[in-house]
Amino acid sequence: MSKQTKTFEENLAELEGIVTKLERGDVALEEALAEFQKGMVLSKDLQKTLAEAEKTLVKVMQADGSEAEMD
């Protein structure tokens, strides 16, 4: 079975849905824990994608052709 890669926007929408669901507070504890774990994984993936995009932008923006890392 192949794992389909979701877009950044799809992952963000899924994370927002999880947050909304948990904020309502009408979820059973077991489901809340599972959703929280899923949200943490999504959050980590989103942060990784943003960091990679930032590195790419820094490389593109260097006028003199040199590459610099952002902190």
From Swiss-Prot:
Main location class: cytoplasm
Enzyme Commission designation: 3.1.11.6
Molecular-function GO terms, alphabetical: exodeoxyribonuclease VII activity
GO cellular component, one term: exodeoxyribonuclease VII complex
Location of the protein in the cell: Cytoplasm
Keywords: Cytoplasm, Exonuclease, Hydrolase, Nuclease
GO biological process, one term: DNA catabolic process
Gene3D superfamilies in alphabetical order: Exonuclease VII, small subunit
Keyword Cytoplasm in record: yes
Reactions catalysed according to its record: Exonucleolytic cleavage in either 5'- to 3'- or 3'- to 5'-direction to yield nucleoside 5'-phosphates
Tagged with keyword Plastid: no
Alphabetized InterPro entries for the sequence: Exonuc_VII_S (IPR003761), Exonuc_VII_ssu_sf (IPR037004)
HAMAP family, per the entry: Exonuc_7_S (MF_00337)
Protein family: Belongs to the XseB family.
Subunit structure: Heterooligomer composed of large and small subunits.
Function of the protein: Bidirectionally degrades single-stranded DNA into large acid-insoluble oligonucleotides, which are then degraded further into small acid-soluble oligonucleotides.
Name the record gives this protein: Exodeoxyribonuclease 7 small subunit
Higher taxonomy: Bacteria, Bacillati, Bacillota, Bacilli, Lactobacillales
